[in-house]
A protein has these predicted regions:
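Detector for C-terminal structural segments
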Residues: 31, 38, 201, 267-270, ...
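A structural "hinge/loop" feature
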Residues: 40-59, 82-83, 109, 157-167, ...
Length: 514
């Protein structure tokens, strides 16, 4: 009898557990600490979704501190976040989001429609101009609903708003921001993500603590520590000593060393980051770069496959495009073969038989490891240039303000589609565009209003063909980062979100039991 009663009680308990929400089941308190060695310097701009700058790097921190209405998650590319659901009107002019009940910021305030409207209107990052030119109004009929009313149907609204193509859908608390001001928010950010701000030492270390009020689940790991370690050898040494659990960007020979080291594992993370060279002076008639033959010569000078093997152990893709291969409306261009003889011939035809001084070669300091082999190949055919690394914040500021000349090492790893990737870099009005071409600008404007998918695809393919024909840029590769993972990690989060290079979602990370 006792045995039968016990079985009935257990069955009842299991039945209750089977219908309980994930949030209700997450009763265990967070424990332990997970640490990362990062390949770039830490700056307060990383806490600020309103300043997302066309790179995937800031989302490493944004995914922890903040939450979006819609965002990429393990189950899908556009998963419900602070919005439980969303819909589009039949005429394509209105997008309505229903907010998640019970979602709160770290200071206890509820996430409301007013916060969503405020976050959009305050957004000033990548593609802000495009969004605000096309949105007629943001309406808040009640605290739990938001409507975006467009000036005309725009097929890319969710590509720009519902993915990390921009930071516009990541929500900050209006009352708190207005109380502390913009500088105060960067000093002590408050978000609605799974982790809350604990401390920050500029350029050195960021510490975040688990937020037990996060709507999706309580994180398993109590504390996250991000350490800025620009030197790759030092990052690997820290991983081997157990000072960090994950070391980002341990490339080339260091990646091989991770493979050989007992207890460590190498995790390649292919993602949507494409790298290229911008010939910033191609619109200056007095510059050698204004001659298409010179730009073609540079394209034939670079041995991309050798670079891929040496730096990323062959995990990157040579695509010939600034558009990731997985993006909607991607067009595969013919690849420029590595041919230094042809490169020299093209330079001679353009009037530079002995090459020329190409001036400065600008790069984000964290990307210089990729820029150096490109520079060496250019030098080998007579294109003489000098590497000029800048700390990331300074590089992005100078890049956007159009203060960089000659050659710029460009890159982007944000989500979206072919249109969202091209808009900041190829269209003449783009945030990082140093010039443009009327035919490309005209086609881009035309595709933005085209609702027929086949016609739109043809327009976007034609733009990509023109970029290739003009040799407007020097595409390098679609990067795969090599990440080192230490022995304490049960779930690193690497690869959980498709095409995303960092650990995420942070609330899913786990340490091994002691």
């Amino acid at each position: 009898m006792t045995s039968r009663r016990t079985r009935l009680v257990m069955a009842a308990v299991l039945a209750l557990l089977s219908v309980a929400s994930p949030r209700a089941l997450a009763t265990e308190a967070p424990v332990g600490q997970m640490s990362w060695a990062l390949h770039f310097s830490l700056a307060p701009t990383l806490f600020e979704p309103a300043e997302a700058a066309g790179l995937i790097t800031p989302f490493m921190i944004i995914y922890a501190l903040h939450d979006a209405l819609v965002k990429p998650m393990p189950e899908k590319a556009m998963a419900p976040g602070l919005a439980e659901s969303w819909s589009r009107s039949p005429d394509g002019l209105v997008y309505e989001f229903v907010l998640r009940k019970g979602a709160r910021f770290h200071n206890g305030e509820p996430v409301t429609a007013d916060d969503v409207k405020f976050s959009f209107e305050r957004y000033r990052g990548i593609s802000a101009q495009v969004l605000k030119e096309r949105v007629a109004a943001v309406e808040t009929p009640d605290p739990g609903r938001v409507r975006f009313r467009l000036k005309q149907p725009w097929p890319d609204f969710m590509a720009f708003y519902g993915t990390p193509a921009t930071g516009a859908a990541w929500i900050v608390p209006r009352k708190y921001v207005e109380k502390v001001g913009e500088d105060g928010f960067k000093k002590a950010p408050v978000g609605a993500g799974p982790y809350k701000f604990a401390s920050f030492t500029p350029g050195i270390e960021l510490v975040l603590d688990a937020f037990d009020g996060y709507w999706r689940k309580t994180p398993s790991v109590k504390r996250l520590v991000f350490k800025a370690v620009p030197d790759a050898t030092t990052r690997l040494a820290m991983l081997k000593r157990g000072e960090v659990d994950i070391a980002y960007a341990v490339n080339g020979e260091l990646g091989e060393e991770v493979r050989r080291t007992p207890g460590l594992s190498l995790r390649p993370t292919p993602f949507v980051a494409t790298h290229w060279l911008l010939f910033a002076d191609q619109w200056d008639p007095s510059s050698p770069w204004s001659d298409r033959r010179v730009r073609l010569a540079a394209n034939h000078a670079v041995d991309r496959q050798a670079m891929n093997q040496a730096v990323t152990l062959g995990y990157s893709k040579i695509t010939g495009s600034i558009i990731p291969t997985s993006f909607d409306f991607y067009w595969q261009p013919p690849l420029h073969a590595y041919d230094p003889i042809k490169a020299r011939q093209l330079l001679a035809e353009a009037g530079y038989p002995k090459g020329f001084d190409a001036g400065d070669f600008w790069c984000d300091a964290s990307a210089c490891q990729y820029a150096e082999p490109v520079l060496n190949d250019l030098q080998a055919v007579g294109i003489k240039t000098r590497l000029r690394p800048l700390e990331r914040a300074g590089f992005l500021k100078a890049y956007q303000e159009k203060r960089l000349k000659n050659i710029v090492y460009g890159l982007s790893g944000i989500f979206g589609n072919a249109a969202t990737r091209m808009e900041p870099f190829v269209v003449s009005s783009g945030a990082f565009a140093y010039g443009g071409y009327p035919d490309i600008d005209g086609l881009f404007k035309e595709q933005a209003g085209e609702l027929d998918p086949k016609k739109r695809s043809a327009l976007l393919h034609r733009i990509q063909q023109l970029i290739h024909e003009k040799a407007m840029v020097l595409p390098i590769w679609q990067l795969a980062l090599l990440q080192g993972v230490g022995p304490r990690v049960a779930e690193s989060g690497l690869g959980l979100i498709a095409d995303y290079p960092w650990s995420a979602p942070y609330e899913d990370l786990k340490l091994k039991p002691r």
